[in-house]
């Protein structure tokens, strides 16, 4: 959320508008994400992949590989952290994700074996793809647009935290469209207000 106080965002539009851009981006993003049922679709994909790859029900290798891959990939932090890294905003979110994934993988590997370690391959490819998207966005977006996108990402991180701590169950993946909408709303506020 420190991006909210970024001077490029604060100076790009009239006083009070940066928070409106962030809130409106989250609102419209949540509406789009809920309409598209992003969270439900990700869960459905995970369940289908898991059942199709583990037909015999006896292979802990496949169970470990699929379960770990899905848990480490299906989540907003994998996308948000990789995009932030690609845009040059730092790797702090990826470090947080890696730490959480590391502890989770220890628990999984104890019961499911070496398949958990091999899940790092699809996770690496997935995160690299999102980092490439971030590299592209970082080259075409203005600083204030990146700050708006990062501020929205900070709100998503709060949602992820509440979910992980079991304080509030939120469909954070449904808020992912807000990341794409925030730079557009920031541009509109910058040019027309």
Language model: regions and residue ranges:
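Hydrophobic transmembrane alpha-helices of secondary-active transporters
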Residues: 1-11, 32, 103-109, 151-165
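Membrane helix-loop-helix hairpins that form the core translocation module of multi-pass transporters
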Residues: 1-44
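Helix-loop-helix junctions within the multi-pass membrane cores of secondary transporters/permeases
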Residues: 60-136
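Juxtamembrane boundary at the C-terminal end of a transmembrane helix
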Residues: 183-193
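Intrinsically disordered, low-complexity non-transmembrane regions of multi-pass membrane transporters
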Residues: 38-64
């Amino acid at each position: 959320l420190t991006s909210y106080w970024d001077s490029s965002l604060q100076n790009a539009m009239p006083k009070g508008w940066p928070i409106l851009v962030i809130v409106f981006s989250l609102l419209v993003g949540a509406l789009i994400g809920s309409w598209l049922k992003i969270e439900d679709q990700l869960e459905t994909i995970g369940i289908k992949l898991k059942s199709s790859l583990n037909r015999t029900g006896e292979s802990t290798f496949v169970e470990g590989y699929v379960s770990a891959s899905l848990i480490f990939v299906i989540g907003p932090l994998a996308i948000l952290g990789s995009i932030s890294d690609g845009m040059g905003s730092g790797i702090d979110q990826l470090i947080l994700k890696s730490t959480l994934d590391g502890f989770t993988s220890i628990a999984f590997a104890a019961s499911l074996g070496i398949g958990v370690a091999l899940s790092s391959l699809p996770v690496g490819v997935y995160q690299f793809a999102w980092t490439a998207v971030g590299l592209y966005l970082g080259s075409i977006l203005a600083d204030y647009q990146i700050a708006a996108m990062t501020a929205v990402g900070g709100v998503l991180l709060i949602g992820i935290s509440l979910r992980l701590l079991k304080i509030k169950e939120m469909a954070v993946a449904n808020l992912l469209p807000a990341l794409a909408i925030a730079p557009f709303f920031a541009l509109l506020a910058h040019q027309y207000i």
